[in-house]
């Protein structure tokens, strides 16, 4: 019912702004709004997404300024936000990522890759919450990969929020630089590279590979009813793999089990990507998925790694572990501006994970140890 149809309708009206998150981009938008209106907008600042949305609904402000990366924050408190609101003007800004890469010879030296998945479809450049958080520790000499899953709600200090503690997923709102730096600091490790994907990326990559096979330990049906997954090896196209990786409500371990399934999808992607029929045709595959992901690994580094595999063609041992913690339903979330459910880290599981990473880097076989760590974590759940 709002009379706000275009940006000029905002003249002399009240515009809500938020004091949480990316203030630099918000200030750029306010400058551009002033140019469009010919005068400074009347602004009211908020420190809580709930109050921000409430006042828009109640008519206490005529419009609010929303970073698309934080749209999900509104949906947590206002499930009908997308239906009840409209966009009257969109401003786009590009920000260069920091030079995060700590380059190594990827065919000789071990390295860590941070895999971050944001909770959106469409263009990969969109900033949003980091819902998939995983460290891949790779040793190219021993052909061993360790995947370490970190829960999205892990409650950790975040440099992009002035060192305040918040859910790991919220680092994605500030960009991949923040996510990587947060994990490096908390785990005490170097992350050499990152790979950033979204929902569309997963579908595109899996489909470009001709589908993948995923080992599913427990049969379940997706909570939205779209797919049923039998126990055992399951062939999946992009849509089915994405739904498998996103499901948590119909899994006994909730978000913990979702993290394990995400690692199973990554394992399926890696195994298919290094298969002879795919890797020998790598240029067409890379062309097919171009624009589906972001990474700071150079083309030369990726090509060197691929050519090493083509010359060798030996298999890779991919192990999976995760870190754990305890749920807290009322911890302060600076990004939300209210108390939220978080996972308080079990520091011992973090130390254990780093121990396994170091062994992979040192060329040790960690198959038995990784299985032991997963069993220890399962016992703590």
Stretches found by the model and what they are:
Residues 6-7, 11, 16-21, 27, ...:
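Non-catalytic, solvent-exposed segments at the cell envelope interface
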Residues 1-4:
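Gram-positive cell-envelope targeting signals
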């Amino acid at each position: 019912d709002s009379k706000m149809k275009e940006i000029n309708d905002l003249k002399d009206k009240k515009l809500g702004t938020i004091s949480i998150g990316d203030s630099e981009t918000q200030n750029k938008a306010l400058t551009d709004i002033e140019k469009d209106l010919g005068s400074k907008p009347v602004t009211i600042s908020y420190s809580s997404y709930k109050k921000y949305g409430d006042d828009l609904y109640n008519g206490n402000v005529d419009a609010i300024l929303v970073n698309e990366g934080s749209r999900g924050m509104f949906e947590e408190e206002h499930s009908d936000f997308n239906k009840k609101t409209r966009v009257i003007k969109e401003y786009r800004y590009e920000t260069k990522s920091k030079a995060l890469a700590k380059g190594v010879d990827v065919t000789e030296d071990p390295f860590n890759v941070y895999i971050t998945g944001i909770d959106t479809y469409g263009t990969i450049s969109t900033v949003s919450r980091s819902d998939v958080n995983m460290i891949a520790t790779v040793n190219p000499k021993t052909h061993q990969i360790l995947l370490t899953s970190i829960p999205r709600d892990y409650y950790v200090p975040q440099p992009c929020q002035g060192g305040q503690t918040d859910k790991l997923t919220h680092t994605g709102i500030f960009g991949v630089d923040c996510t990587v730096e947060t994990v490096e600091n908390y785990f005490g490790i170097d992350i050499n590279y990152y790979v950033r994907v979204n929902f569309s990326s997963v579908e595109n990559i899996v489909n470009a590979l001709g589908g993948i096979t995923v080992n599913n330990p427990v049969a379940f049906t997706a909570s939205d009813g779209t797919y049923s997954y039998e126990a055992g090896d399951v062939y999946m196209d992009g849509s089915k793999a994405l739904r498998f990786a996103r499901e948590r409500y119909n899994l006994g371990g909730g978000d913990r089990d979702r993290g394990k399934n995400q690692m199973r999808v990554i394992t399926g992607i890696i195994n298919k990507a290094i298969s002879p029929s795919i890797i020998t045709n790598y240029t067409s595959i890379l062309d097919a998925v171009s624009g589906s992901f972001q990474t700071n690994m150079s083309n030369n580094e990726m090509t060197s790694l691929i050519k090493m595999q083509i010359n060798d063609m030996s298999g890779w041992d991919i192990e999976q572990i995760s870190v754990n913690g305890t749920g807290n339903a009322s911890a302060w979330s600076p990004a939300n501006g209210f108390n939220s459910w978080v996972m308080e880290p079990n520091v011992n599981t973090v130390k254990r994970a780093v121990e396994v990473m170091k062994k992979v880097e040192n060329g040790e076989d960690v198959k038995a140890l990784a299985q032991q760590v997963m069993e220890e974590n399962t016992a703590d759940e």
